[in-house]
Amino acid sequence: MKKIKLRDYNSNMGIFIDVNYNDSKIVDNSLHIQYDNLLINHKELIDKSKKYYIYCNGGVKSRKVVSMLEFYGYDVTLVEK
């Protein structure tokens, strides 16, 4: 599992997805896709040809999402606080 710190992310790296249930904007121009919605509907919501950076406040949900999306062949990186 690839990981980076939140402070090291910049928008040129790829698409930032916040999987928290609240709609707070941690990063400008980020996507907010709730955890369960992304797990169930990833084929409709994201594109395998793009690079994604997955974040949540606690880290548990984002870690699960990254593991699952890696399994399905997505280019994802876990973003930690």
What are these regions (language model features)?
Residues 27-38, 53:
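A short alpha/beta connector and helix-capping loop motif
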Residues 1-27, 35:
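Flexible, polar/low-complexity N-terminal or interdomain linker segments that lie immediately upstream
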Residues 42-81:
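Catalytic cysteine-centered active loop of the rhodanese-like fold, especially the PTP/DSP P-loop
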Residues 8-11, 40, 44:
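Charged/polar, solvent-exposed surface patches and flexible loops
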Residues 23-27, 39, 60-62:
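Glycine-rich nucleotide phosphate-binding loop and flanking beta-alpha elements
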